Amino acid sequence: MENELEHLNWNIKHALLQLEGPLAQELDSCLEVSPGALSPSNSVYQKILDTVQVLDKLLVTLTPPHMTLVDGVFAFTNSKVLLCASEYALADHVQKLQPCSISQLAEATGLHEQGLFQIVRYLREMGYFSQDPKTGLLSNNRLSNLLRKDHWATWINWVDFFPREYYDLLSRLPDQLRSDQPKTATELFYNTDKPIYQYLAETGRAAGFHKVTGTGSVVEAPGLLADYPWEEVKSETVVDVGAGVGDFIRSYLEKFPDATAAAFELPSTAEILKQRFPDDDPLTSRIVSITGGDFFQDPIPESSVYLLRWILHNWGDEDCIKLLRRIRETMVIKPGVSRVLIIESVLFDGRLGRGARYADIRMLARCRNKERTLGEYRKLAEEAGWRLNRVVSPRGCLTQIMELRPVGACTGSPRANGNGNSAGGLEWESELM
């Protein structure tokens, strides 16, 4: 085993020298996902994900158990340190001062220098900020840039939200798990019997929730709009069922100047959505309708293309099947065109499935529901009159796009040149696994 480990160490160190040296610029280019910069090579990005997945498995295999346990026990420290970085706008100050010393940063932020040094040291070990090995001066890097309040992706909204209220909320998760406890951790934390989304609306917390979900829409839009073949539905009105406050619709219409869309949401959220698309907004004329209602009871707008983004994970299997059947019954059938696009975080093993596992516990605590595996989504689809035709894993996203086609209503058969149901093979443009 010693020889194998020596060989492994040599190869890893050699790869690091290349990736941090002559390949650094190319790597940065491949990892940058933004509205104005998206590498034309999706295949290289997927190879990077393959490598991350394998290295994570290697890390899990080699790490001594006590180190893994300690990491789990103190994982909350990561969230709280990131919260400090956000609270005091460290990345924003570094951006103005860079390169800067800890003393300069402490003076600019009004923070205790020793405490700031410890926070920055922790952040550096997480990968945030670059530090000159000779001078010790700090600069932003591709990771710390995500903490800037002026960054296009607004990730800072997540950093401000989840380590605060959600952190406190999860303290009630052990209570929820008792077999005699009918309430969720969220209901216990807020001391309410009302459904969570109703409670958020009635207590003025809905705006903060939509701000966070809106960030997810903004962050994922470049990859979602680049890596799925939207040209196949360019002549159709895409109905966003559960559209939130319209962040995805805005990105979609901005990306495709000839596209049209429609939104279906709860009445209170639909009103907010209408306010975000006033008459003088040039995109408003391409929004066919904004409808308020209950998608289990009220009529859903007719179309041949529907989008459900971060919707099914809120509901149990029976409700998911009911909703998918309602859409199937409402859908305008156009062979080769009609489809519903399910955008969710699919559960799978390894590092690349970690985001979905985080979300799975959030859904458990929020509404006693869950994220699902690809097999579970396939089963839901089949029971509701659909078939899973294609799965796409877009760049820069925490989600996958699952394309469902109505059974018996479209020509062709599911394509199958993917790389299997593994995260690394998630060039799942894969089309059917």
Curated annotation (Swiss-Prot):
Disruption phenotype: Abolishes the production of all diketopiperazine derivatives but leads to the accummulation of large quantities of L-7-dimethylallyltryptophan, as well as the trans- and cis-isomers of L-7-(3-methylbutadienyl)tryptophan. Keywords: Methyltransferase, S-adenosyl-L-methionine, Transferase, Virulence. Residues 413-433 are annotated as: Disordered. The keyword ATP-binding does not apply. Signal peptide: none annotated. It is an enzyme of class 2 (transferase). It comes from the Eukaryota. The keyword Transferase applies. Its EC number is 2.1.1.-. S-adenosyl-L-methionine binds at E265, G293, D294, F295. PROSITE patterns: SAM_OMT_II (PS51683). GO terms for molecular function: O-methyltransferase activity; protein dimerization activity. One of its GO terms (biological process) is methylation. InterPro entries: COMT-like, O_MeTrfase_dom, Plant_O-MeTrfase_dimerisation, SAM-dependent_MTases_sf, WH-like_DNA-bd_sf, WH_DNA-bd_sf. Pathway: Secondary metabolite biosynthesis. The active site is at H313. Gene3D superfamilies: Vaccinia Virus protein VP39, Winged helix-like DNA-binding domain superfamily/Winged helix DNA-binding domain. O-methyltransferase; part of the gene cluster that mediates the biosynthesis of hexadehydro-astechrome (HAS), a tryptophan-derived iron(III)-complex that acts as a virulence factor in infected mice. Within the pathway, hasC, with the cytochrome P450 monooxygenase hasH and the FAD-linked oxidoreductase hasG, convert the hasE-prenylated Trp-Ala-dipeptide into an O-methylated diketopiperazine that is then released from the hasD NRPS. The HAS biosynthesis begins with the synthesis of a tethered Trp-Ala dipeptide by the NRPS hasD. PANTHER family: O-METHYLTRANSFERASE CICE, PUTATIVE (AFU_ORTHOLOGUE AFUA_4G14580)-RELATED. Belongs to the class I-like SAM-binding methyltransferase superfamily. Cation-independent O-methyltransferase family. COMT subfamily. This is O-methyltransferase hasC.
